[in-house]
Each structure stands twice: as C-alpha cells, then as structure tokens.
Amino acid sequence: MIKRMLTAASVTLILSSGFAQNNTIYIELLGNGLLYSLNYDRMVTDKISVRAGYGGLTVSNSTVSSGVIVTEDIKITLIPVLANYLRGEGNHKLEIGGGIVLVSLDYTGNVADVDFSLAADGAIPTGNLGYRYQKSEGGFFFKASLCPFFAETMVTSVGLGFGYSF
C-alpha cells in the first residue's frame, strides 16, 4: 500500500513540473511530520501547490526486569503528501490544504534472548491551515500552520516551516 501511495505522490509531483518554476525545500518542525519533516513543495499554479515530505523517529530502550534484559527499538517513518490552495496577494498567503500522511511502524525487541518484531503500515488523513510567506522570485520561505490529523480522534499539531524557494 505504501509503494502505491508513494508512486501516486511521485507522479503528481512529476506531472506538476511543467506548470511552474517555484520549487521549495524546507524543514517543518512538528506539523504533519510529527516531530520534524524535510519537504519538497512545488507550485502547480499561482494558487495551487503540492507537497511531499519525509519525517522519522527512532526510539531505543533497554531495561532489566527480574534479572532479564529487555531491549526495544521503535522506528516510525512518516511521509506527508498534501495539496494546498493559496489565497492572498503578494508574498503573504493563507494556505489551506489536505492530504494524507503515510505511516510505517517497525517494532523490534528481545526478551531473554528471544527476538520478536511487529510492523504496520497505514495512512492518516490530514490537513493544514495557516500562513505562508513566499516570494514569487524565490528566496527565504516561511510557514506557520495548524495541522489536524483525522484518526479515530482528531489530533491537531502546529507546524513551523523554514526553507528556500527557487
């Protein structure tokens, strides 16, 4: 499922490459990528952009319980893929977007020399609503947004993005 979604996101970005010259590379703290994400954003028209990113987190833990060593590793990979509508004049825009976050979870552990693992993949619908500063001629890029995740319960994060448009 993840491979099909990545293919769809790649095709979207490739097809949009003929319509505009505005590319942006930026880092978003928190937001749609959980703790952080590295993102590529492409302007399709002067009001529409598409975005794909990569974020991840690895946590390792070792404990001793009743004389038994327990080790655990959790790796979470997040790939936000969104389309955005931009409203406003000049360099200052309101950004409204929606898409999905592809999630991959790998859990491995060892208890008393017995290895075990668990892996899961999925997609979480997401959105964003916020402010975007981007010059049409390129240069410094900034965004601040609210990023809801529509899982069993809605969870909202805030995101701050800094980067470069070219």
Predicted regions and their residues:
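Hydrophobic alpha-helical targeting segments used for export or membrane insertion
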Residues: 10-11, 15
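Gram-negative (and chloroplast) outer-membrane scaffold detector with strong preference
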Residues: 41-146
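Short, surface-exposed connector motifs at secondary-structure boundaries
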Residues: 21-23, 140
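Polar-ligand-bearing catalytic/cofactor-coordination segments
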Residues: 165
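Solvent-exposed loop/turn segments connecting transmembrane beta-strands
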Residues: 24-39, 55-58, 121, 147-159
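Sec/Tat signal peptide C-region and signal peptidase I cleavage site
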Residues: 16-20
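Sec-dependent signal peptide recognition
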Residues: 2-8
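Membrane-embedded beta-strand positions in outer-membrane beta-barrel channels/transporters
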Residues: 26, 37, 80-82, 126-128, ...
